[in-house]
Amino acid sequence: MLGLGRVFSSAVRPRTLIRAPINKRSFLWYSTEAAKEEKPAEEKVAETENVDVKELQSKLSELKSKYEAKDKEVAELKGSIRQSLADYRNLENRMKRDMEQTRAFAVQKLTKDLLDSVDNLERALSIVPEEKRNNRESNKDLVDLYEGLAMTESNLMKTLGKYGLVRYDGIGEDFDPNIHEAVFQIPVEGKKPNTVFHCESKGFQLNGRVIRPAKVGVVKGDD
């Protein structure tokens, strides 16, 4: 019985694990191989980073070129707009001048046609003696006619004056061949030589330009 217990005791006794000895050379070989396997991954990361930088540089260069092209295009458009505005202003000014010249020409033709009517009204008024104009009781019809003609002439000259027509006689002024036409010259006592002392027909200027000179008598100087 005692012998059976020993056999059973030795049968259930746990076995002791024995660690195999580590070979240093094998460990170094495994470490080197692992390092060799890890190195290509690092190189791939570096290569990927290099590729990303190059792509960014390429995109930046492309964007810069596009920006410069757009900037140039905008500058050209601005220049075209400025030129178009300048051309428009020049055209507008030219059209304005042409319209003014056309208007002035039309007014000049109209006023020249009306000068005879103005002269006739003036002559009609000048032939009525002053004493009869001032005596309404005896010459009522004549005075009424005179006042009607005077009002007609005044209104006509005001209307023509709106378009730049000016009437002048030149009496007392120095003779100017640009605005006066001398019809005779005589010595006049107390008058300055070469001055206008008489007007046969008045002159007219339209917007500063003579359309008919005044026909005048001029004081003659001593020879």
From Swiss-Prot:
* UniProt-listed GO biological process terms: [2Fe-2S] cluster assembly; protein folding; protein import into mitochondrial matrix
Q: Does the keyword Transcription regulation apply?
A: no
What is the protein's known function? Essential component of the PAM complex, a complex required for the translocation of transit peptide-containing proteins from the inner membrane into the mitochondrial matrix in an ATP-dependent manner. Seems to control the nucleotide-dependent binding of ssc1 to substrate proteins.
User: Care to name a GO molecular-function term for this sequence?
Assistant: protein-folding chaperone binding
> What HAMAP family has UniProt attached to this entry?
GrpE (MF_01151)
Give the similarity note.
Belongs to the GrpE family.
The protein's predominant localisation is mitochondrion
Give the matching PROSITE patterns. GRPE
Q: Which Pfam families match?
A: GrpE
For this UniProt record, give its keywords in alphabetical order, as a comma-separated list: Chaperone, Mitochondrion, Transit peptide
Q: How does it assemble?
A: Component of the PAM complex, at least composed of mtHsp70, mge1, tim44, pam16, pam17 and pam18.
Q: Which organism is it from?
A: Schizosaccharomyces pombe (strain 972 / ATCC 24843) (Fission yeast)
**InterPro entries associated with the record:** GrpE, GrpE_coiled_coil, GrpE_head
* Record's protein name: GrpE protein homolog, mitochondrial
Annotated Gene Ontology cellular components are: PAM complex, Tim23 associated import motor
Q: Which PANTHER family match?
A: GRPE PROTEIN (PTHR21237), GRPE PROTEIN HOMOLOG, MITOCHONDRIAL (PTHR21237:SF23)
- Subcellular location field: Mitochondrion matrix
CDD domains linked: GrpE
